[in-house]
């Protein structure tokens, strides 16, 4: 998924720099999850974290409720009016289920220009074309702990001597 500050171009290099052995992998500033999704799953304890609650909710719904999420996305329209309505609802923190909020947020990312969530991108996009990606992400996230914490609190909770920490500031 496109995300501001994403590590798509660097993911291969980052994974090659991992030590041969580590017990924990903590994605401190998770964003689009490019490194986590590129890293082969193993026996290590994995944590994905991001401070953006909408993004974390989306990944939790992908992991825990993929069928409900895909159903909520099945018949959405690709229109500027819907984009504006969704953006407004999320900005107002309108009451909605976690799945509905995840579906809205995913629509906002997919329909916005450069995934920036601020302007309608006007490119037609059939959400159903992403269902296989949602299913793949669901399988990959099955054993991943997903957190929505400030990075200092996250590190205090999870960091131990054998942790492989990936924070973009260290690269």
Describe the residue ranges of each PLM region.
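Single conserved hydrophobic/aromatic residue that forms the stacking wall/gate
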Residues: 164-171
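Class I SAM-dependent methyltransferase core
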Residues: 27
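Conserved SAM-binding loop of SAM-dependent methyltransferases across substrates and taxa
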Residues: 34-42
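Short conserved loop adjoining the S-adenosyl-L-methionine
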Residues: 155-158
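S-adenosyl-L-methionine
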Residues: 1-20, 24
